[in-house]
Amino acid sequence: MKRKKFLALAPAGVMTAVTLTACAPLDALYDWFFGGGGSASHGSEKGRVTESEELEKQLEKYFGLSETTASDRAKQTLEAVAKGFDATWLDNNKLNDKAKDALIPITQDKVQAKQALWVDVMELTSPDGTADITLDNRPIYSDRYVDPGPDSGDPYHWVYLVDPSNLRRELDYYKKNDAELYAGTFQKDGKNYAAMVTIMNGWW
């Protein structure tokens, strides 16, 4: 179940994003790939993000989350990712080191101490809009703001690419059903992308 509770953007927030690409209209892609239903649109122009509740439900199932929050900061982070996205961020439709470096300035002013943020982006490549949106065995972007505590050093960002199965294990271990999740689609240079933003608060 998703709580449609939009949180105010804090001085430093957290989030993750997803992108989608195809020749068919987005509504048709949703109906074909996700088995019907609709999407909540938040803008259809190029570079604007359209929320996909179908994809969010798929991610909730993958991560084993019974309840998530759609926050303003997750939405705004996803929009920033979509705006800055470049096709060179993907190798074999997976995020690469160039994507990691480009995402750092987008996410680091949005992550607070003891929060973790994940982003994934993928293109829909086939003419009919189909894509294998399996998260296993693909690197996703991870930004953790580590606070060692008093007399143990300054807070720092720990940024790397990680398999989403690690995120699934952490969400299960820490019982983070209050995670913030936002997923949607955008267009860039004639292509459609799917993207996700996930935020976990208090990861240790």
Language model regions located:
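Bacterial Sec-dependent N-terminal signal peptides
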Residues: 1-8
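Short, low-structural-confidence N-terminal segments
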Residues: 4, 30-33
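Bacterial Sec-type N-terminal signal peptides, specifically the leucine/valine-rich hydrophobic h-region
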Residues: 17-20
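Surface-exposed receptor/substrate recognition regions of extracellular proteins
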Residues: 26
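Short, well-ordered surface patches within globular domains
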Residues: 32-121
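A well-ordered secondary-structure block
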Residues: 104-204
